[in-house]
Amino acid sequence: MWKKRKEHLIPLEKSKKIIYLEKRGRRQEKKSVGAICFAVLAVLCLLYCLTIALFMGYGTAFFAVWGALAVVCGLVSFVLSRKRLMQKLPRVLKIMVVICFILGLLCFGVVEGLICSRFAATAQPGADYMIVLGAQWKNNGPSYVLKKRLDKALEYLQENPDTYVIVSGGQGSDEPVSEAQGMYEYLSEAGIEEERILLEDKSTSTYENLYNSSSLLDKGKDRVVLVTNNFHVYRGEKLAEKMGYMHIEGLAADSYPAMLPNNMLREFFGIIKDFWIGKL
């Protein structure tokens, strides 16, 4: 009789089943540190996105990326907080995700370090030409970042009366005049002689700013000072060097502190894109 019963017994390895008991009350299972961190990041990204949209002036819709980051961080937090779901995920997949995350952080850190390395860029006196990169021109005058560039350019031009300046930037759909025309009027009204100001009013990007401006000078011989905001100097210099400017120096203007995280993140993607397509 014992033998018959034994024949109907299910092997131990086939009968194993893990039962998770849901913890309730004060002894409820605590959230993982990773889930909490990503939840906090999601809230911060969402708040920053809304702050830019509601209270700060912005020239592009890039700030929406912070909203997308909030969604991604929220989803990651949700997954990390679900123990059963984490148990079901293949180990190989989890290892690959962790490796990609670490490599992404390293890449981000290196690029941001390069950007920060040119935050305080200064230029030697006596340049032949200066190029002021364009930015949004509003109905009531230059945007904050463009005004900072123009004021920094004005300081250098007043101290170096033999330097010519190229103001570079076309007219966007939301701009009353071309950026170059607006900058021309700003500098001339500040006392810079009109014959020293050259206009390049067709460009729509940093690359085009530099490419179109190169026809107004000699890239191989002339010393050129490139004026832009601190977060933008590194990319501007590298684009110019790749384009054949042999004597290029960045001159860093200040930027709006509250918008710096947004501008730094945008520069990161800009550098990655330009490197990918061979412009850097």
Enumerate the predicted regions with their spans.
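Short, positively charged and aromatic/hydrophobic N-terminal segments
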Residues: K3, L9-I10, K14-L21
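Membrane-water interface of alpha-helical transmembrane segments
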Residues: Q28-A39, T60-A64, Q87-V98
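Membrane-embedded alpha-helical segments of integral membrane proteins
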Residues: V33-S81
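Structural signature of transmembrane alpha-helix termini at the membrane-water interface
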Residues: L47-L54, L75-R82, L106-S117, I272-K279
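Cytosolic-side transmembrane helix boundary signature
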Residues: A68-C100
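Hydrophobic membrane-insertion alpha-helices, especially the h-region
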Residues: M96-V110
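A structural signal for short, hydrophobic/glycine-enriched beta-strand patches
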Residues: V110-M264
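A transmembrane-helix-recognition feature enriched in membrane-embedded lipid enzymes
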Residues: L260-L280
